[in-house]
Amino acid sequence: MPKRYLFTSESVTEGHPDKVCDQISDTILDALLSQDPASRVAAEVVVNTGLVLLTGEITTKAQVNFVDLVRQKITEIGYTDSDNGFAANSCSVLVALDEQSPDIAQGVDSAQETREEKSDQELDAIGAGDQGLMFGFACNETPELMPLPISLAHRVTRRLAAVRKTQLGYLRPDGKSQVTVTYEDGRPVGIDTILVSTQHDATIGDITDPAAVQAKIKEDLWNAVVLPVFADIDIKPDDNTRFLVNPTGQFVVGGPQGDAGLTGRKIIVDTYGGYSRHGGGAFSGKDPTKVDRSAAYACRYVAKNIVAAGLAEKCEVQLSYAIGVARPVSILIETFGTGKVDEDRLLQVVQENFELRPAGLIQTFGLTKLPGERGGRFYQDVAAYGHFGRTDLDLPWEATDKADLLKQALSPALSGNA
């Protein structure tokens, strides 16, 4: 990396078509797990003008009305006007669900360790729901130990959605943000560009000229969104920061009418904004036996505790799994030259102190019980604005309860480096 460089991350609002799908998928998951924590769920959603398709594979004892759940979530997001081409009460909802494949189920229900190696350990009972590789990341750029660009991008979209609901009534649900941060010697030092694209009414009060409409939106967003977002942050926009709003000149047609949406298409928004690697697996609509989701949460948990313990300024963790096998195939820890101890020793301590089998992840985080314990909604709340670094939610994988344990276990190595 050069000494001075720019890094960009994006976020999208809850009304973005892909995020509509993610939230519907996780609303279905919440409803099923609330009634039957053993539910196996892979709920996929497609949205387009006037249409929602719910498909995938589900095995459950729960009894839910899928159509009602879909319409309720769309209403909550804000699509209630059929004149905009997509509305909760007028869209068609098609349901095409199958049961989980028995070939997959047999490997999840009884892991290889139990079937072939005759392990009697309870946590060896559940096999990974698929093969795959997952990454987790943490760094000390923000209090929540997230990269600054994605943290800011999420702040902008969350604030944009909030002012749509409470202050700027001419805004519509679809929207995106993008924040470009200036780095020097690996540390953020400035804000180069802030981009906001937001769906809006064609006119604002008596303002009908398109250019005047955009000027009004830009002024309002600067005052109601950008300034509050940066109010408590040391690094702020300055006279050299570019502020771009709806660069096409207009954003009236949006949401599922403007673009089809699909579950699982915003995996970089869901994670670290491109700052860390990604294994490719999406989260939403998947029950916790799917390691795409649960192991990615575990990777974040490990990485965050390492950084919180002061053992590294940056940490990336990779896990990989084989379908039907409980124990990870591989574990990798990378600290990018910022680690205070040898990575091999760090890996050893992580393996000794973190449970990384699927049943262990489910048990550690309570992943199958959380929807029922939290009033029927948990996963749908992380389906927009990121699964990590959420200071507004109580997420078990964001805990730093292992930091002191790691420091204690590695204290001899830390003393040796002093």
From Swiss-Prot:
Named cofactor requirement(s): Mg(2+); K(+)
The protein's enzyme class: transferase
UniProt-listed Enzyme Commission number(s): 2.5.1.6
Signal peptide: none
Cofactor note: Binds 2 divalent ions per subunit.
Subcellular location, record wording: Cytoplasm
Residues in coiled coil: none
Self-association and partners: Homotetramer; dimer of dimers.
Function recorded in the entry: Catalyzes the formation of S-adenosylmethionine (AdoMet) from methionine and ATP. The overall synthetic reaction is composed of two sequential steps, AdoMet formation and the subsequent tripolyphosphate hydrolysis which occurs prior to release of AdoMet from the enzyme.
Binding-site positions, ATP: 16, 174-176, 259, 265-266, 282, 286
Record-given protein name: S-adenosylmethionine synthase
GO molecular function, one term: magnesium ion binding
